[in-house]
Amino acid sequence: MTRFAPGAPAWFDLGSPDVAASADFYTGLFGWTATVVSDPGAGGYTTFSSDGKLVAAVARHQIDTPYHRPYGPGNDQHGMPAIWTVYFATDDADALTKRVETAGGEVIMTPMDVLGLGRMAVFADPAGAAFAVWRKGVMEGAEVTGVPGSVGWVELVTDGIGAARDFYPATLGLAPADTGLKGVTDPVWHIGDTPVAGTQELGVTGAVRPHWAVLFAVHDCDATVRRAVELGGSVENEPADTPRGRRADLLDPHGAGFSVVELREGYPAAAGGAS
């Protein structure tokens, strides 16, 4: 069975100005194992594994656009921004590129093959939130999600939710649906009956531009926050109880935003949307 249905968040990587330093931070924070891809053409691309299963990666960031600086121009010390990118599964990156253009998005990187592992492209939605798509080859995507030590959830952080309600169904096939929670009006994105992503109003964290945010599942939110600070990270929002679970919003030492969350039992977590 295919793990990731088209439109589901399938892969997650960090663009960083200093791959080695970023690898040290995240392995120290989450207990991941970092492995540098041996192919010379990979440019030092480094994968992260949790208990032997791929969860994410880090690469040297070589794209610098306003879309890749959601926390503003001063969120790095090395001349290039740091940002987590969410890759959504697709059966056809080229056809999806045409849909993005038709729906009012922007093509940041046209489709390209990646070492036989798959085919990718990078876009921005009409509000300016950057995201990528992944057509699987040898690599399908993350081997585990939704459990501590892996990506637990992703969210569209935006001030353009009206446009998003039109754009993402037309491109990724994501259907917006109400959460059913009192006082929460931002939609959850579904593939069929499966929730695969959420939405957050821009301004809740220090971000100044729309973006796709990555939430990592952890056993202990407060302890993880303390460890992040010890390793050189900083806190955007202190741990607090939310409908999804206890959560905090952080910046890594190079300014990449991410969140950590103790997933509440029975609440939707990251999933492939496969059937």
Swiss-Prot record:
The keyword Repeat applies. Pfam families: Glyoxalase (PF00903). Pathway: Antibiotic biosynthesis; daunorubicin biosynthesis; Antibiotic biosynthesis; carminomycin biosynthesis. InterPro entries: Anthracycline_SecMetBiosynth, Glyas_Bleomycin-R_OHBP_Dase, Glyas_Fos-R_dOase_dom, VOC. PROSITE patterns: VOC. Transmembrane segments: none annotated. Coiled coil: none annotated. This is Anthracycline biosynthesis protein DnrV. It comes from Streptomyces peucetius.
